[in-house]
C-alpha cells in the first residue's frame, strides 16, 4: 500500500500570496456576502428549457412557478436564470434588446415579481444573468448610436472608420464569407452600413456590439479608443448600476455577470476592470447590502479582489474539474471506467466539441491530470480565505453535461455529483440532478452551435415525466425548443439516439440502466440520482465542514492517483471523501494524513460506518493504520 500525503504546496503558496496586498494594491477587505451562500447550492435554470406553461414548446416563468415545490424539495438555496430579458434570440438570449423588460416568450415583469415573491416564501433566492459587455444590434441604444456622433447613446459603443490592422481586415474578410456570418465569432470588428462609421467592435457574434467601458491605455493613434473616464464609458457604467438597481427593486437577490473580466479594453494589469467592479461593489453595499454578485471570471484572486462575492470554476479552464475522470493512457490495472469501449476517447467524446486534436494533451497521465487540478483548485480556494467564494459547476449552458460520452451510467454520474456537491460552493445545472444526457449533433437552435462548438446538447428541455415531450410541454414533439432524450441509451449523438430508440421500441435494444431519465421515474426510487443529489445537499446543510468557507485539503500520491481523497474541515468537524471513478478495486492507507483530524473516537478499531456510501466501499482502522477500500465506481463520505 502506498502512503498518501496532503498537498500543501499550493495552499502555502496561496496563503503567502494572500498575505500581500490584493491585486492592484487594493487594501479593501470585502465581506463574503449573505449567510445563505455558506451552506448554499445554486440551481442554474435555462428558462427556455425548464417548464412550458402555455404549450408553445418554450419554457416560461409561470412554468418555473409551477415547479417551485420541486426546487424546494431539492434543497437548493437560490435559482440563477440565464437571460430572461427581451432578446433578438440569435445567441440564446445573450443578445439583449431591452434590459428592463422580461421577454414576452417568458411572460411579463409582473410574472417575474410573482416568481420572486413565491420563491422567497419558500426560502429560495432569485438571481438573474447580467450581460454587461454587449447588447443586441437591435437595441435602441445601438440603433441611435449608429446615426451620429453627438447623440445620447453615440459613445455607448466603439466605432471606427477604419480597421486597426491587417489581421482585423483578414478576420473580417473570413467572417463575411460565412453564409451565417451573423453567428460567427471570428475577429473583433464588424462592417456596418451606419451613417456615422464603417465598423463597430463586437464581443462574440456580429449581432453583439461591444459596450464601451473605455480603454485602460488608449492609443492616441486610434481615435476610437476612449479612456475609462470619458463621457461615454462613464455613462455606460451608470447604466449598469441603473439596470442592477431596477431589478433589485423588483426583489431580485443578485446577478451572475457574463464576461465580467473583459469589459475594459487593453487592460493587461486589470487595474481598470478592478476599479470598475469595486465602484459597483461599494455602491451595492451601500444601497443593497444583502445582495450577491457572481462572476464569470475563472480567477478568484482577481475576481474577489474586485468586489465579487462568488467566482466560478469555468468549464473553459485548462485544469478543468472533469479531466481527471478520463484516463487517456489507460492504466495497466484496467484504466479508467470512463474510457470509451476500451479505446482512447475522441476529442468530441471527451469535450463535446470539435476542437483541434493538437489542443488536447493526450500524453498527460491520470496522476498528472489530477495533481494539476488539485494544485489549481487548492490555489483558487485558498485565495478566497478572506473574501468571497469559489463555485464548482456540474455543467452549464455553454458546455456539455456530466452525462456525456462514455460517462453515462447512474453510478458514474453519482461519483461526479458527489465530487461537486462536496466542494465549497456547488452550482447544480438543471437536469443534472436526474442525469440528463448531453448528446452531440443536436439541432442548432438560436445560435447554440458555432465554430465546431456544440451547446444544444446542454440546453434540452427538463425531463419531468415519460412521453414524447417528457412532461415539459403539451405541444407536439416537433414544436419542442429542443428534443428530449429520456432513455438510458449508450448513444453519444442525437442521430445515434434516434436509431437506438427505434431498436429499443422494437425490443431489439436494452437500456444501460433501469427506469428513465425523468423526475417521475426517479422520484420514489431511493437509489436514483435525484435522491442521491437531494441527500448530498441535505448533508451539506447540516455539516459546517462542507460549507463554502471550510477548508479543502486534497490527499494525493502521484503513483496512485485513485481513489481521489480529500478532506473538508472547519477545524471542529472533518469529513473525508474518497471517490473511485475507475473500473478497478482500489485500496490505500491514509493513517498519518488523517490523524490530527480524528474525533474523540480515534482509538476505535474496526470498520468505520461512512455517512454516505456509493457502491461498495469501506474505511477500516487497524493497528497498522487507516485503510480505505473502494470497489469500481464507488465512493464514501466519512466523518472523522
Residue ranges and their predicted role:
Residues 621-640:
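C-terminal beta-strand-rich structural cap/linker in extracellular carbohydrate-active enzymes
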Residues 582-598:
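Surface-exposed beta-strand/loop patches in extracellular or lumenal glycoproteins
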Residues 20-238, 249, 256, 260-309, ...:
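Acidic/aromatic-lined carbohydrate-recognition and catalytic surfaces
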Residues 137-178, 277, 281-461, 466-469:
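Conserved alpha/beta catalytic core and glycan-binding cleft of carbohydrate-active enzymes
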Residues 1-4:
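Positively charged n-region of N-terminal signal peptides that target proteins for export
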Residues 23, 27, 37, 307, ...:
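Loop/helix patches that line or flank the sugar-binding groove of alpha-linked glycan CAZymes
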Residues 605-625:
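Solvent-exposed beta-strand/loop surfaces of large extracellular or lumenal domains
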Amino acid at each position: 500500500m502506498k502512503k498518501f500525503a496532503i498537498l500543501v504546496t499550493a495552499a502555502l503558496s496561496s496563503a503567502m500570496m494572500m498575505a500581500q496586498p490584493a491585486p492592484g494594491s487594493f487594501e479593501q477587505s470585502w465581506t463574503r456576502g449573505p449567510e445563505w451562500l455558506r451552506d448554499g447550492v445554486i440551481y442554474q435554470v435555462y428558462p427556455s428549457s425548464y417548464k412550458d406553461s402555455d404549450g408553445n414548446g418554450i419554457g416560461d416563468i409561470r412554468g418555473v412557478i409551477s415547479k417551485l415545490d420541486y426546487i424546494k424539495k431539492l434543497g437548493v438555496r437560490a435559482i440563477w436564470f440565464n437571460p430572461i430579458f427581451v432578446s433578438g434570440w440569435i445567441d440564446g438570449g445573450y443578445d439583449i434588446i431591452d434590459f428592463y423588460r422580461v421577454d414576452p416568450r417568458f411572460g411579463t415583469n409582473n410574472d417575474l415579481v410573482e416568481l420572486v415573491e413565491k420563491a422567497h416564501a419558500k426560502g429560495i433566492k432569485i438571481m438573474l444573468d447580467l450581460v454587461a459587455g454587449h447588447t443586441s444590434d437591435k437595441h435602441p441604444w445601438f440603433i441611435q448610436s449608429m446615426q451620429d456622433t453627438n447623440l445620447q447613446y453615440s459613445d455607448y459603443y466603439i466605432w471606427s472608420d477604419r480597421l486597426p490592422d491587417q489581421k482585423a481586415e483578414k478576420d473580417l474578410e473570413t467572417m463575411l464569407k460565412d453564409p451565417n456570418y451573423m453567428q460567427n465569432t471570428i475577429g473583433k470588428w464588424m462592417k456596418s452600413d451606419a451613417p456615422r462609421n464603417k465598423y463597430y467592435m463586437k464581443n462574440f457574434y456580429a449581432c453583439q456590439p461591444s459596450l464601451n467601458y473605455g480603454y485602460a491605455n488608449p492609443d492616441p493613434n486610434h481615435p476610437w479608443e476612449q479612456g475609462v473616464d470619458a463621457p461615454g464609458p462613464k455613462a455606460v457604467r451608470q447604466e449598469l448600476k441603473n439596470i442592477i438597481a431596477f431589478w433589485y427593486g423588483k426583489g431580485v437577490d443578485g446577478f451572475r455577470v457574463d464576461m465580467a473580466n473583459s469589459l475594459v479594453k487593453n487592460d493587461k494589469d486589470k487595474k481598470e476592470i478592478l476599479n470598475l467592479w469595486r465602484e459597483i461593489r461599494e455602491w451595492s453595499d451601500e444601497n443593497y447590502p444583502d445582495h450577491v454578485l457572481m462572476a464569470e471570471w475563472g480567477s478568484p484572486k482577481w475576481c474577489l479582489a474586485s468586489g465579487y462575492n462568488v467566482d466560478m470554476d469555468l468549464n473553459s479552464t485548462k485544469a478543468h474539474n472533469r479531466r481527471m475522470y478520463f484516463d487517456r493512457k489507460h492504466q495497466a490495472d484496467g484504466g479508467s471506467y470512463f474510457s470509451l469501449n476500451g479505446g482512447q476517447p475522441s476529442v468530441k467524446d471527451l469535450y463535446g466539441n470539435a476542437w483541434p486534436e493538437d489542443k488536447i494533451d493526450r500524453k498527460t497521465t491520470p496522476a498528472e491530470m489530477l495533481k494539476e487540478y488539485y494544485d489549481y483548485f487548492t490555489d483558487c480556494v485558498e485565495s478566497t480565505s478572506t473574501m468571497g467564494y469559489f463555485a464548482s459547476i456540474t455543467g452549464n449552458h455553454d458546455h456539455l453535461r456530466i452525462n456525456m460520452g462514455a460517462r453515462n451510467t447512474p453510478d458514474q454520474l453519482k461519483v461526479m455529483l458527489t465530487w461537486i456537491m462536496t466542494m465549497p460552493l456547488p452550482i447544480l445545472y438543471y437536469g443534472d440532478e436526474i442525469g440528463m444526457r448531453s448528446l452531440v449533433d443536436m439541432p442548432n437552435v438560436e445560435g447554440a452551435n458555432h465554430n465546431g462548438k456544440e451547446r444544444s446538447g446542454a440546453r434540452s428541455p427538463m425531463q419531468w415525466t415519460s412521453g414524447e415531450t417528457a412532461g415539459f410541454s403539451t405541444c407536439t414533439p416537433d414544436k419542442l425548443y429542443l428534443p428530449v432524450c429520456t432513455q438510458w441509451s449508450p448513444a453519444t449523438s442525437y442521430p445515434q439516439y434516434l436509431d437506438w430508440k427505434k431498436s429499443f421500441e422494437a425490443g431489439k435494444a436494452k437500456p444501460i440502466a433501469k427506469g428513465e431519465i425523468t423526475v417521475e421515474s426517479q422520484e420514489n426510487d431511493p437509489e436514483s440520482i435525484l435522491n442521491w443529489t437531494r441527500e448530498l445537499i441535505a448533508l451539506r446543510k447540516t455539516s459546517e465542514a462542507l460549507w463554502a468557507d471550510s477548508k479543502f485539503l486534497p490527499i494525493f500520491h502521484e503513483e496512485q492517483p485513485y481513489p481521489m481523497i480529500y478532506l473538508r474541515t472547519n477545524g471542529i468537524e472533518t469529513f473525508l471523501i474518497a471517490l473511485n471513478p475507475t473500473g478497478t478495486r482500489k485500496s490505500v492507507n491514509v493513517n498519518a494524513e488523517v490523524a490530527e483530524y480524528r474525533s474523540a473516537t480515534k482509538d476505535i478499531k474496526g470498520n468505520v460506518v461512512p455517512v454516505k456510501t456509493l457502491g461498495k466501499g469501506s474505511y477500516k482502522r487497524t493497528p497498522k493504520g487507516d485503510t480505505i477500500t473502494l470497489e469500481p465506481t464507488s465512493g464514501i463520505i466519512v466523518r472523522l
